Regions:
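Bacterial lipoprotein signal-peptidase II cleavage site
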Residues: 21-26
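Asparagine-centered strand-capping/turn motif at beta-strand->loop junctions
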Residues: 27-33
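Generic structural detector for well-ordered beta-strands
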Residues: 28, 53, 63, 91-93, ...
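Post-signal-peptide N-terminal segment of Sec-exported extracytoplasmic proteins
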Residues: 39-75
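Short, aromatic- and glycine-rich surface loops/edge beta-strands on solvent-exposed regions
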Residues: 75-81
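A short, solvent-exposed loop/turn motif at the edges and junctions
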Residues: 81-89
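Extracellular beta-sheet/turn segments enriched in Thr/Pro/Gly and aliphatic residues
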Residues: 88-117
Length: 117
């Protein structure tokens, strides 16, 4: 392989590697309940994201960034769903390092089911 081609490939991989944002988590929410969900809060204990009006049988992807304070210890996420006042703790992060997977969250009338993907 020519040196010029090696340089192009190396530049591509380095730019890809450094452009990856591993400072947050992706969550996919699916409303499987019989009605519209008024609001949802997902938090890591420091930062939170608020989602309004998730309609019946609809899906929404949201991204929670770790920006206010990078945790220096282990922790977990939690979700609150209104108006049902459902709350569930789930997942983990270690020393503020975000896991490499995401979460599917299924919201039902009286329960929350969470799967890693």
């Amino acid at each position: 392989m020519k040196p010029k081609n090696k340089l192009i490939i190396l530049t591509f991989f380095l730019s890809f590697f450094f452009s990856c944002d591993n400072k947050g988590m992706l969550f996919e929410l699916e409303n499987k309940s019989q009605k519209k969900i008024d609001s949802i809060i997902i938090s890591n204990g420091y930062d939170e994201i608020k989602i309004k009006n998730l309609y019946k049988n609809k899906t929404r992807k949201v991204y929670l960034k770790f920006v206010k304070q990078k945790p220096k210890s282990d922790g977990s996420f939690f979700i609150k769903v209104f108006p049902n006042n459902l709350r569930k703790n789930f997942g983990y992060y270690s020393n503020g390092i975000v896991p490499s997977y995401s979460y599917n969250i299924f919201l039902e009338d009286d329960s929350i089911t969470i799967e890693e993907y």
